[in-house]
């Protein structure tokens, strides 16, 4: 049987479940897939199919994640669910599964718990733009006032981490009832209300091709009689022959013009997000450009050296350090295509960071890198990955 062709007629959105252990994230994931498959077509997934998540590698780090797909009337969703708390931390920091929005699952019987708070903070730090709340296990709570109290606590927690608590959709229901096909208000209808909230509250993300042109430099050649060719994969936007671009990072920003776009040894009039291209640059010498810089639309991205970041430090078992590190630790930070040395400043209340921890740090690089909030990086020592991070806030 041939695999069905992937018809992308509907806009695509990436989401995922977050929240405290045992509050029902995986049950909800199964319930959404099952209820929506019944209504809009697609594959129903059982709890156990989602729970034994396969291992993947992202930036040298092993993460367990389950991927589920489902559709609503207007959209196609890819949904990630992680079995363990550590997997969530790693997933969100490495950006292995970037989310356009998250579904925060909170048990009505327990209210917000430590990981509820930690996942909201992580979502804020790594730049998850929208959160929708599913108040789960409402079938176990008879007291309406108690439900309202839990709802209020969740809204306050969202506010605390700069999400709009008052405007956040909160759907009450029971993932377990929905998975069993229950037609009462807390069962299947609650899942359809959640789907409606996903469709209306999370905006359709900008496609990579619609962004401002950006291409990390992978290699630089000089071709006699033609000039300098820079190769790389276009990360976002479109580049056309004759357009002016900037070369940003490591040294002072330079301006130049693209006089040719090549792909598979053929000349094109443009390259776009996802393409591996060679760009011919006018009047640029081979020694003016190096790995670690980016080519970009003028003014669209600036070079920085000083920023705060959320990082995950690999455990010994993951091939990371065997010992903690302290203030002023100086590893390499691998951004896009190259390593830059930098020093780490720990929060005032942290004396050291143990392998397996996640922590907020401040970094100062010795050379500037083109960066934006949300940019991912690896932390390396002598070519070996010892951590992963994401830029939370740019300082300078």
Swiss-Prot record:
Q: Which reactions appear under catalytic activity for this entry?
A: GTP + H2O = GDP + phosphate + H(+)
Q: Which Gene3D superfamilies match?
A: P-loop containing nucleotide triphosphate hydrolases (3.40.50.300), Translation factors (2.40.30.10)
- Matching InterPro entries: EF-Tu_GTP-bd (IPR041709), EF-Tu_GTPase (IPR050055), EFTu-like_2 (IPR004161), EFTU_2 (IPR033720), G_TR_CS (IPR031157), P-loop_NTPase (IPR027417), Small_GTP-bd (IPR005225), T_Tr_GTP-bd_dom (IPR000795)
Protein's UniProt name: Elongation factor Tu 1
What is the recorded function of this protein according to its Swiss-Prot or TrEMBL entry?
GTP hydrolase that promotes the GTP-dependent binding of aminoacyl-tRNA to the A-site of ribosomes during protein biosynthesis.
Disulfide-bonded cysteines: none
Organism source for this protein? Acidovorax sp. (strain JS42)
Signal peptide segment: none
Where is the segment annotated G1?
19-26
Q: What residue spans carry the region label G3?
A: 81-84
E.C. designation(s): 3.6.5.3
Q: Name one GO molecular function term.
A: GTP binding
Give the binding site residues for GTP: 19-26, 81-85, 136-139
Q: Where is this region: G2?
A: 60-64
